[in-house]
Each structure stands twice: as C-alpha cells, then as structure tokens.
Amino acid sequence: MEEERESLYEEMGCFDPNTPAEVTVESSFSQAEPPPPPPQVLVAGSTSNSNCSVEVEELSEFHLSPQDCPQASSTPLQFHINPPPPPPPPCDQLHNNLIHQMASHQQQHSNWDNGYQDFVNLGPNSATTPDLLSLLHLPRCSLPPNHHPSSMLPTSFSDIMSSSSAAAVMYDPLFHLNFPMQPRDQNQLRNGSCLLGVEDQIQMDANGGMNVLYFEGANNNNGGFENEILEFNNGVTRKGRGSRKSRTSPTERERRVHFNDRFFDLKNLIPNPTKIDRASIVGEAIDYIKELLRTIEEFKMLVEKKRCGRFRSKKRARVGEGGGGEDQEEEEDTVNYKPQSEVDQSCFNKNNNNSLRCSWLKRKSKVTEVDVRIIDDEVTIKLVQKKKINCLLFTTKVLDQLQLDLHHVAGGQIGEHYSFLFNTKICEGSCVYASGIADTLMEVVEKQYMEAVPSNGY
C-alpha cells in the first residue's frame, strides 16, 4: 500500500482543477484507511514493535499555505481509486517507506516554492510605478473591498476558494512591495488634478460652511487677470479680482433710504393725495405750496384792510369832534401814512381808498373736487362730485353758514360726475378766505358721500 501511495505522490503534479482539495484527499484515503489503532506516535529510528499500526493519514496529510496555491492552480491533479489494500505490512517495512515518503514530501515543497515564484511574476511590474499611484492613497489590498476574489482568478482556483480553507489561501502580491507615498507634482496640480496644497487656504465662515481659496501664480495663463483667486463657497464658484468693491456703496444706500423717507414725509403733508407715485406726489406738493403762498397773501390783505378801516374810522371820529384845524391835521396824517409791506401797498390806495383782493385755491380728492376763486368781494365756486348723491342742498347750507350771498347757480352731468358752479358775494362784515371755503365744502360733501355709499363697496 505504501508503494502505491509513493507512486501516487510522484505522479501528482498538483491538484485536479475541477475538484476541491479537501474532497479529493478525503476520497483517496477513505478507502485505504485501516481500523483506528490506539493513539500512539511512531518516532524515526525506533525499534519498538508495538507502534507498527501507525495511522498513515496523519503522516501523509499536510496543510496548504499561501505559497502552495499557485502551483495547485497550474497543473491538473490525477487520482486513481485503488481497491481495498491488503493487511498492513510489518513495522520495519513501514518505517522504510515512511523515510522515502518524507523525502518525496520535501521535493513536493520545492515544487510549491517554484509555483509561488511564478505567481509573484504574474503580478504587476513593481519597477515602473505609474504617476497616478502617487496621487492616490494605495490600499493594503490590491482587490476592491466589495469585490469577490473568485472573479479575478481562474475557474479551477475559484473552486478551491469556495471551500472552507479559502481564507488561508488569500494573498496580496502588492502588500510586500510597500510603496512609499511620493510627493505630488506641482505642475499636475496646477492643471486641476487637486486643489488642496501648500498655497491653498481653507477657511470656515460664520455659518459653519467651508471656503476653499486656490491661488494661481503669475506664470500661469489666467486669461488677463493679474492676481486670480478661485473661491469655493458652499458649492458656488466665483472668479474675479481679489480686491473687488461691492456694487452699491454705503453712501449710495444711505442716500436712497434718505430719499424714500423724505418722499414718505412729503406724502403725509399733502391734505388729500390722489396718487402714490413719486411724480404725482411732487406735483401735488408743488400745487399745495403755491396754495399756501396764496393763502398767506390773502391773510395779509385781510389784516391790512382791517387796519386801514380802523384808521379811517378813527380819523372820522376826530373830524366830528373838532373844527377845521383838525381836518387839516387829518389830511397830514393821511399823507404821512406809509404801508408796512408790498401787500399793504397793493391794498391801500391813498387816492380812492379802495383795496383789491384776489386769491385762487383748488382742492381735490378721489371723489370730490373744489375750485375757489376770490376777486375783491366776489367768490366763484366750482364743485365736481361722483353722482351718488345730490350735493346741491348741502352746498347751499354751507354757503349760508359762511355768510356768502348766492347770486347764481348752474349745474349739469358729465359722465359719472355732477358739476356745479356757484357765483356768490361776500357780505359786508364777513371775514372769509379761499382755504376756509374749500376745506368746509370738502368736509361736508365727503361726509355725505360716505354715508350714502354702502359698506360693501361702490
């Protein structure tokens, strides 16, 4: 039996590519295994006859190592199932066969070493390392971490790897090379292969984001910019000069805010603004200023007229009490009287003792328009309103309250509006002015109109 097994090992180059190693070994020795003897160990050179029945499988069985796998994957393995062996030979013959078997086992180990060298030669050439490896962190294993090793190996070797001893056969040919990390190439980094380096800056903004600044030197062709900075801020890239001013300066921003505030204040000063745009606000403000100036002139004329009236009445009283000498003094006082202003000069005329009064005022709202003109003691009023109510009755009541004598009234309908024209005269002893007449009419007519309009709208 030992001679057959010795010939079996001599014929064996490596394992069968279509049969796993463990299954083949078990199938070849299962039939030749004798009954299990007591657990005894045979020592070389021993002459004891009690250890003759040595278990042959313990001597012939050997374990696979990482160096044994390449040879096993290159040469087919042939096994022949022999018939049941005869009874075991004597111990002396078994001892001699064991010595020959150990010699053949050493020869087999040399074959595995040669196979390992062939497997190393199959790996990539370590003398020429590509430049791409210097830019990457090389893993300790050449295979991908989520890749099964059987996809890169031959079919026969994948069958061996599928067994329970596949972990002992795994081997990485690049592990023993231990490539050092090479310094990066600055020229390749300038072309865009990497942005982080010595001249790169990483900053953290106030919101917790990361800003990466990459500086390009003067020798690089940067398209006309002397000093360029690439800024990466939360995924947004901006290219431009380093010292770049904002589009809107603080002075311009403050000026715009100041103008908006002034327009808002001007709108609040207008009594009844019709539109909210800036052009309309400015136009209505100009009209309102002119109106105020006319009102001031009107007040000055009224004050001067009253003062002149008091002066005349006082002089007349003196004439009634005294004689002719007093009349001469009155004429001298009248000649010596001088007006205190230009308005006084226009109102006071020493030749005929007459004063000319002239004023004009216009007020307008969304639903009502009032135009008042005063020439001496005659007052002309024009009133326009939407045709919701008849405002003629309320207007006549207001004229009676202002002590205006109504001489003529004309009216008509123009589209969706009523238009009325009133010709009145100021009664003697009455003190009225254009702004007072317009404001009173606007207040009364607007109140009656809002009461007539339903609450749900027009």
Swiss-Prot record:
One MF term in the entry's GO annotations: DNA-binding transcription factor activity
Keyword tags: DNA-binding, Nucleus, Transcription, Transcription regulation
Entry GO CC: nucleus
Source organism superkingdom: Eukaryota
Annotated PROSITE patterns: BHLH
Induction: By UV treatment.
Location within or outside the cell: Nucleus
The UniProt record lists the keyword Transport: no
Keyword Methyltransferase: no
Chief location: nucleus
Membrane-spanning intervals of the chain: none
InterPro entries: bHLH91-like, bHLH_dom, HLH_DNA-bd_sf, MYC1-like_bHLH
Compositionally skewed regions (Acidic residues) per UniProt: 324-334
Domain bHLH: start-end pairs: 243-292
Region listing for Disordered, in residue ranges: 1-49, 315-338
Biological processes per GO annotation: anther wall tapetum development; callose deposition in cell wall; pollen development; regulation of DNA-templated transcription
Subunit comment: Homodimer.
The name this protein goes by in its record: Transcription factor bHLH10
Organism: Arabidopsis thaliana
Gene coding for it: BHLH10
